[in-house]
Design a protein with these regions (language model features):
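FMN-binding flavodoxin-like domain, especially the glycine-rich phosphate-binding loop
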Residues: 1-8, 12-39, 43-186
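Iron-sulfur cluster-binding cysteine motifs and their immediate structural context
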Residues: 189
Length: 189
């Protein structure tokens, strides 16, 4: 399949979503990269069908950050393949990936991959560290490997019709033990 450009779109106030997304883009091996940073402003972008898109956003309270969702409204696909990435603060991403999937599909994208990564929580402090230093070197290496697998999937498809979508509902979420959740809630309340 002939895809030779990747459009990287991100919202990343603490830079963790940006770091993970950049690693995934590197892993694809595509060198023609267009970047849209939605952290400070909105953008109107129409993505052509033969362009891979990577969208990376943070999770706040188990959902895609509301401001990120607002700023993504101007992004439209034309049946374009998209990779969805949510970065959460080591508590839980809950239904954020499903929410982003519904949005991307409604905007005309074909979801071909989805991923969740841990980033240092925005409430993390020296006294109460929550995933400090994440994404770390191992996380970013895994993100690059994920990008390479996406490229393999694209290369294996004869055409867009054979670039099969992924059902993010089937991605197994890690179990959240009650004690760490309780400790987290105690710290932030």
């Amino acid at each position: 399949m002939d895809i030779n450009e990747v459009h990287f779109i991100y919202f990343s106030p603490t830079r963790t979503s940006k770091q993970v997304g950049e690693a995934i883009v590197r892993g694809t091996g595509l060198t023609n990269v267009v970047t849209t940073n939605l952290t400070l402003h909105t953008a109107e972008v129409d993505i052509p069908e033969n362009t891979l898109t990577v969208i990376a956003v943070p999770v706040y309270g188990g959902k895609v950050a509301p401001l990120a969702m607002e700023r993504l409204q101007g992004i439209r696909g034309s049946g374009s393949p998209v990779v969805l990435v949510v970065v959460y603060g080591n508590r839980a991403y809950e239904k954020a990936l499903i929410e982003l999937d519904a949005f991307a599909s409604a905007q005309g994208f074909k979801v071909i991959a989805g991923a969740t990564f841990v980033g240092e929580h925005s409430y993390s402090t020296e006294q109460n560290p929550i995933a400090p230093g994440r994404p770390d070197t191992n996380d970013l290496q895994y993100a690059e490997e994920f990008g390479a697998k996406i490229r393999t999937k694209i290369n294996a498809a004869v055409d867009m019709e054979h670039l099969y979508p992924v059902d993010v509902n089937r991605i197994q979420r890690p179990r959240q033990p009650f004690l760490p959740l309780f400790k987290f809630l105690r710290r932030v309340i």
